Curated annotation (Swiss-Prot):
This is U1 small nuclear ribonucleoprotein C. The lineage of its organism: Eukaryota, Metazoa, Cnidaria, Anthozoa, Hexacorallia. SMART domains: ZnF_U1 (SM00451). Belongs to the U1 small nuclear ribonucleoprotein C family. It is found in: Nucleus. PANTHER family: U1 SMALL NUCLEAR RIBONUCLEOPROTEIN C. Its main location: nucleus. InterPro entries: Matrin/U1-C_Znf_C2H2, Matrin/U1-like-C_Znf_C2H2, U1-CZ_Znf_C2H2, U1_snRNP-C, Znf_C2H2_sf. Residues 58-138 are annotated as: Disordered. U1 snRNP is composed of the 7 core Sm proteins B/B', D1, D2, D3, E, F and G that assemble in a heptameric protein ring on the Sm site of the small nuclear RNA to form the core snRNP, and at least 3 U1 snRNP-specific proteins U1-70K, U1-A and U1-C. U1-C interacts with U1 snRNA and the 5' splice-site region of the pre-mRNA. Residues 113-138 have a biased composition (Low complexity). The keyword Ribonucleoprotein applies. GO terms for cellular component: commitment complex; U1 snRNP; U2-type prespliceosome.
């Protein structure tokens, strides 16, 4: 009669009956071995992913800078300056001025009246701009 082999525990069970397998699979040692097996497998998968990512970055040049760019060239438009502002001696690229200080202006076509300063709309759907409420219509 063939014996049941547990790959996780690296052992043969005494019998190949469902009750023996069930008892073995519910045991503390078997559960620890299964947990250890999958933990090790996940670590190997993570390391493989790290190795693939590292190899991909080492095989490609810096993709944010154009090829054969001279050192010190600004990144392409849309790239934000580093935290803390621009490094000394560098100017922002032409065509991308810094916004003026103060509140952010409304987007083009927003139109309508804004609430007085300090009175923001709280909760609920925003009323439509440009039309009086239903209660004020005649």
């Amino acid at each position: 009669m063939p014996k049941y082999y547990c790959d996780y525990c690296d052992t043969f069970l005494t019998h190949d009956s469902p009750s023996v397998r069930k008892t073995h699979n519910n045991g503390r040692k078997h559960k620890e071995n299964v947990r250890f097996y999958y933990q090790k497998w996940m670590e190997e998968q993570a390391q493989t992913l790290i190795d693939q990512t590292t190899a991909a970055f080492q095989s490609k040049p810096n993709s944010q800078m154009p090829p054969n760019a001279p050192p010190g060239l600004m990144p392409p438009p849309g790239m934000l300056p580093p935290p803390g502002g621009m490094p000394p001696g560098r100017m922002p690229p032409q065509g991308l001025p810094f916004p003026p200080p103060g509140p952010i202006p409304p987007p083009p076509g927003a139109g309508g009246m804004r609430p007085p300063h300090g009175q923001m709309h709280m909760g609920g759907p925003r009323p439509q701009m440009g039309r009086p409420p239903m209660s004020l219509r005649s």
